[in-house]
Amino acid sequence: MAFGAGAGGGRRPFFRRRKTCPFSGANAPKIDYKDVKLLSRYVSERGKIVPSRITAVSAKKQRELAQAIKRARFLGLLPYVIK
């Protein structure tokens, strides 16, 4: 079966807007393992660290963020797994 031009088969190219890192800038928040409210925004509902391609955090700040989350987990401020 042949599809005509009116079938809507053409796709527009996906335009991805580059987001800026929320931790870089003049009044950006500091990454601190004691700031549970900030860290919980970068942990999924299952307790996993959200990747930087979703959160738009730079590579350097993503490493700092992961270290802070792991520190908070070790001290019992954040859970390892959320059921």
Curated annotation (Swiss-Prot):
Alphabetized UniProt keyword annotations = Ribonucleoprotein, Ribosomal protein, RNA-binding, rRNA-binding
Q: Spell out the molecular function terms from Gene Ontology.
A: small ribosomal subunit rRNA binding; structural constituent of ribosome
Its BP terms in the Gene Ontology are:
translation
What InterPro entries does UniProt report for this protein, alphabetically? Answer: Ribosomal_bS18, Ribosomal_bS18_CS, Ribosomal_bS18_sf
Q: Which Gene Ontology cellular-component terms appear in the entry? A: cytosolic small ribosomal subunit
**Which PROSITE patterns does its entry note?**
RIBOSOMAL_S18
For this protein, the record's NCBIfam families field holds:
S18 (TIGR00165)
Q: What does this protein do?
A: Binds as a heterodimer with protein bS6 to the central domain of the 16S rRNA, where it helps stabilize the platform of the 30S subunit.
How the protein assembles, per its UniProt entry? Part of the 30S ribosomal subunit. Forms a tight heterodimer with protein bS6.
Question: Which family is this protein grouped under?
Answer: Belongs to the bacterial ribosomal protein bS18 family.
The protein depicted here goes by the name: Small ribosomal subunit protein bS18
Give the originating organism: Methylobacterium radiotolerans (strain ATCC 27329 / DSM 1819 / JCM 2831 / NBRC 15690 / NCIMB 10815 / 0-1)
Which gene name does the record give? rpsR
